[in-house]
Regions:
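Periplasmic/ER-lumenal interhelical loops and adjacent helix-loop junctions
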Residues: 185-233
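Multi-pass membrane glycosyltransferase architecture that uses lipid-linked
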Residues: 1-195, 228-368
Length: 368
């Protein structure tokens, strides 16, 4: 890469990570040692790592072919997510399909694999297939940890409906699935398998995070270990506050809708908000947030962050671009829009899905 990917805003991780993750040849992630290099290797969860590995086998030792194989596979993931949303809410699924976030970030990284599994789990939740909800969330968490966050609102909804057995089934099936996927690799190659957790624990605050802004603009630099602990504490406190605030205004609100503020707060409080992480929010915007106005505001702000981020990276690499300050202003704008969306969700009556009743928050059920 020579910097044009930043100037033209057409960056993807797929091509450079073909080499960084050592996907040429027959190396098995976690099980075969990484060759010495200056970059991290095996830094993704099991399901994503082997998604990449399969794409590498299909494409041989050709980085360009590897990119196009991933384009096909990730497009299928996008189609699965869109199809699930169409079944849940036919009219609103078009929001996902036409979102600039999807168009720009679908091929930046492999997050759409986890998005597809999380959205399929959401469909299974509304069909009351709680065993499958857990299986799909477990698979999603084996691809990217964020789908595990859905266990909180989904189980809370079942408990609110006085169905503790379903909440337990959901949690246990998710845990069993995640363990079934991960345990063989942890047992056979613990050092390689643990690299994902080690890498993310040691990773410093990224350009897009509030922690980085505090350090860069206010000289309030927090050590990485303290950021990790503080982020968790802040997240627990903020989620609890949002939950209580919503319950005071609307005691019978659908608990599954907590998925939206939880995901937003994870992105705002965490130390990394990579561009493709915005894909996590799209299904929640489609299903939960009332009206298109705030969705359009988020899409505009996210587009501004995307363009100024890579323009700034172009400036860093010497091909020209906007200064860092413009990018940081756009970050603050997007954060403000997301906070506005969460406040609106707390203050306004909850949106009901087509056919959903206040006392029965499930689509016409298949017997579980």
């Amino acid at each position: 890469m020579d910097g044009r990917q930043y100037r033209l805003a057409c960056y993807t991780d797929i091509v450079p990570l073909f080499g960084t993750e050592q996907l040429a040849g027959g190396r098995l992630p976690y099980l075969d040692a990484c060759a010495p290099s200056g970059s991290n290797c095996d830094e993704y969860p099991v399901l994503t790592m082997y998604f990449m590995r399969v794409a590498g086998w299909i494409s041989g030792d050709h980085p360009e072919r590897f990119f196009w194989v991933n384009v096909i596979l990730l497009s299928l993931c996008a189609a699965v997510a869109a199809g699930c949303l169409y079944v849940i809410d036919t009219r609103r699924a078009i929001w996902f399909a036409l979102a600039p976030t999807l168009a720009l970030q679908v091929f930046v990284n492999w997050d759409l694999l986890a998005v597809a599994l999380a959205t399929a789990a959401t469909l299974a939740f509304f069909r009351r297939r709680d065993g499958w909800v857990g299986v799909l969330i477990g698979l999603g968490a084996a691809a990217k940890l964020y789908p595990a966050l859905l266990l909180i609102p989904f189980a809370a909804d079942r408990l609110r409906g006085r169905q503790p057995d379903r909440a337990i089934l959901l949690w246990w099936s998710a845990a069993a699935t995640w363990i079934a996927v991960n345990l063989p690799f942890a047992a056979a190659g613990l050092h390689g398998w643990w690299e994902f957790f080690r890498f993310n624990g040691a990773r410093p605050a990224d350009w897009d995070s509030a922690w980085y802004l505090l350090c860069h603009r206010l000289s309030l630099c927090v050590p990485t270990g303290l950021i990790n602990v503080s982020s968790i504490a802040l997240l627990v406190g903020l989620i609890s506050w949002v939950w209580m605030a919503k319950r005071r205004r609307e005691p019978d609100f659908p608990r599954w809708q907590l998925a939206f503020p939880i995901l937003v707060l994870v992105l705002l409080v965490g130390k990394v908000y990579s561009p493709q992480f915005s894909l996590w929010l799209l299904p929640s915007f489609v299903l939960i947030l009332p009206g298109p106005r705030r969705f359009l505001a988020f899409e505009a702000a996210d587009l501004a962050v995307f363009l100024t981020r890579f323009s700034f990276f172009g400036d860093l690499t010497g091909v020209g671009g906007l200064p860092q300050g413009v990018f940081e202003i756009m970050l603050l704008l997007r954060a403000g829009v997301l906070i506005w969306c969460v406040v609106a969700w707390v203050r306004e009556p909850s949106r009901r899905l087509p056919g959903e009743r206040a006392t029965d928050r499930a689509l016409p059920a298949a017997h579980a």
